[in-house]
Regions:
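Acidic, glycine-rich loop-and-beta core segments that form the ion-binding/anion-interacting portion
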Residues: 1-17
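Charged (often Lys/Glu-rich) extended helix/loop segments that serve as interaction or gating elements
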Residues: 16-158
Length: 158
């Protein structure tokens, strides 16, 4: 597919293309559950961050699809854009988002962040003592999929 697209370009000589399509192939393979430790207006302080499984959310600013885990409680229909801050107190432990979540999210709520891909677990560090080696395997539908058969759905992409 990449070669076919390159051949449609109107240039005399194609450059050598080197790519690693890993994210496109396995983005949907992983998600993580984070806990909200503190909320200050549109800032959520969570128990994971860029030194944990969410590196790509900070440095290249990938906006992970997110959903509140409701545990049966009523959630607001009003959605709000949030920034995330990780637990390390380091200025790099920040994820700009926007992460669109219900307006009534509060401390001790849980959020699923999807599309971690192959590198979520690989990039984890033990910086400032925050590290967990607990991994649980569950099966569920992805938070968001690029393979959705219903093309009438639209997603906010930042």
């Amino acid at each position: 597919e990449i070669k076919k697209s390159l051949n449609t370009l109107k240039i005399d000589k194609l450059p050598e293309i080197i790519c690693e399509p890993g994210r496109a192939l396995v983005a949907e393979s992983g998600s993580t559950i984070v806990r909200v430790n503190l909320r200050k207006k549109q800032k959520l302080y969570i128990n994971d961050g860029t030194y944990g499984t969410l590196f790509d959310g900070g440095v290249p600013n990938i906006v992970y699809p997110s959903r509140l885990i409701t545990n049966g409680r009523m959630i607001s229909k009003k959605m709000t854009a949030f920034d995330f801050y990780g637990p390390t107190c380091d200025s790099m432990d920040y994820m700009k988002g926007p992460f669109i979540l219900p307006n009534n999210i509060k401390e001790n709520d849980y959020i699923e962040l999807g599309q971690l891909g192959a590198y979520g677990l690989t990039f984890r560090t033990q910086f400032n003592g925050f590290y967990s080696d607990k991994i649980f395997e569950v099966e569920d539908e992805p938070v968001m999929t690029m393979y959705d058969k219903d093309k009438s759905k639209s997603y906010l992409v930042a």
